[in-house]
UniProtKB/Swiss-Prot annotation:
It comes from Salmonella arizonae (strain ATCC BAA-731 / CDC346-86 / RSK2980). This is S-adenosylmethionine synthase. Its main location: cytoplasm. L-methionine binds at E56, Q99, D239, K270. Belongs to the AdoMet synthase family. Keywords: ATP-binding, Cytoplasm, Magnesium, Metal-binding, Nucleotide-binding, One-carbon metabolism, Potassium, Transferase. Its EC number is 2.5.1.6. ATP binds at H15, D164, A165, K166, R230, F231, D239, R245, K246, A262, K266. Catalyzes the formation of S-adenosylmethionine (AdoMet) from methionine and ATP. The overall synthetic reaction is composed of two sequential steps, AdoMet formation and the subsequent tripolyphosphate hydrolysis which occurs prior to release of AdoMet from the enzyme. InterPro entries: ADOMET_SYNTHASE_CS, S-AdoMet_synt_C, S-AdoMet_synt_central, S-AdoMet_synt_N, S-AdoMet_synthetase, S-AdoMet_synthetase_sfam. The gene is metK. Gene3D superfamilies: 3.30.300.10.
């Protein structure tokens, strides 16, 4: 492969699409707290002065959609019309129906283990040993930059920052190993009264330098900080936002393949979400076990059918045991039926709003990030 560049991007919690994701998952969490077996497919649309929450929800719970929406927007930091969006005065519209009984009869079973998949589809999971969290470096550091932006905005270090921001990091690879960072882009919404030079210096000192490892930065690294020169109009006033529009930011930054299904607003019976989490769990444990340096898992389902229609293990030539053996180990140690993976990862809890910004993978507090099966896999593979 020799030398190549690879780029990933992330967006902050105040990006319009991410506002939508967080509202959808806040609604999901509120429902799961009362009714863990609820069926939820919650979509959100945000635009200047307005939030529309819709979808299909079947539950015994009652939740206040308007209050959840306003609280979520408030926590993100849109609390004044000067920012282009205000949690206290925006309109909140609701258009929610029930899940189709045709889908329901394919999912529900007398024996929970025979619970069918809520839809057909294909999902991917990925892991690599190039970072401590077994994630690709470009997306990991892109996330950390916008997380840092939110941190210094909220703690008052840089009070002129506003919630909307984007990051992009280009890494240099040589023969598959990281040798440096080629380019960094960080665009952040800001108050009217900060000049470009002061903004660029502060972003470099308070956001970029504390996050990016100095050994990967050199004199040829290019920095683009608010390259348009002005970013006052942002958030839903700058662009409308929709749930499920940042699926590459949510996953591996383009380093792995994607089955196309979004995550936010979906309860765990939707394999788009739960099976993608399970595939990450499988891939991460394989890499943590030292059975491969990189691992990508594909799993697929038919609607109403419990057993996956396929399982694929790809290790890009980095495997320490054969692909056939890896596939057998996956089938032996991981139950990838919809109910099985819900139990395996304990998914019927209100844990989803936190996933909806800064990536669903690579943060150790989520159950699919555990490496508790690594030693079992290593022993079963016969590696010392």
């Amino acid at each position: 492969m020799a030398k190549h560049l690879f780029t990933s991007e992330s967006v902050s919690e105040g990006h319009p699409d991410k506002i939508a994701d967080q509202i959808s998952d806040a609604v999901l969490d509120a429902i799961l707290q009362q009714d863990p077996k609820a069926r939820v497919a919650c979509e959100t649309y945000v635009k200047t002065g307005m939030v529309l929450v819709g979808g299909e929800i079947t539950t015994s719970a009652w939740v206040d959609i308007e209050e959840i929406t306003r609280n979520t927007v408030r926590e993100i930091g849109y609390v004044h019309s000067d920012m282009g969006f205000d949690a206290n005065s925006c309109a909140v519209l609701s258009a929610i129906g029930k899940q189709s009984p045709d889908i329901n009869q394919g999912v529900d079973r007398a024996d929970p283990l025979e619970q069918g998949a809520g839809d057909q589809g294909l999902m991917f999971g990925y892991a690599t040993n190039e970072t401590d969290v077994l994630m690709p470096a470009p997306i990991t550091y892109a996330h950390r930059l916008v997380q840092r932006q939110a941190e210094v905005r909220k703690n008052g270090t840089l009070p002129w920052l506003r919630p909307d921001a984007k990051s992009q990091v280009t890494f240099q690879y040589d023969d598959g190993k990281i040798v440096g960072i080629d380019a960094v882009v960080l665009s952040t919404q800001h108050a009217e009264d900060i000049d470009q030079k002061s903004l660029q210096e502060a972003v470099m000192e308070e956001i970029i330098k504390p996050i990016l490892p100095s050994e990967w930065l050199n004199t040829s690294t290019k920095f683009f900080i608010n390259p348009t020169g002005r970013f006052v109009i942002g958030g839903p006033m700058g662009d409308c936002g929709l749930t499920g529009r940042k699926i590459i930011v949510d996953t591996y930054g383009g380093m792995a393949r994607h089955g196309g299904g979004a995550f936010s607003g979906k309860d765990p019976s939707k394999v788009d979400r739960s099976a993608a989490y399970a595939a990450r769990y499988v891939a991460k444990n394989i890499v943590a076990a030292g059975l491969a340096d990189r691992c990508e898992i594909q799993v697929s389902y038919a609607i109403g059918v419990a057993e996956p229609t396929s399982i694929m293990v790809e290790t890009f030539g980095t495997e320490k045991v054969s692909s056939e053996q890896l596939t057998l180990l996956v089938r032996e140690f991981f139950d990838l039926r919809p109910y099985g993976l819900i139990q395996m990862l304990d998914l019927l809890h209100p844990i989803y709003k936190e996933t909806a910004a800064y990536g669903h993978f690579g943060r150790e507090n989520f159950p699919w990030e555990k490496t508790d099966k690594a030693q079992l896999l290593r022993d079963a593979a016969g590696l010392k």
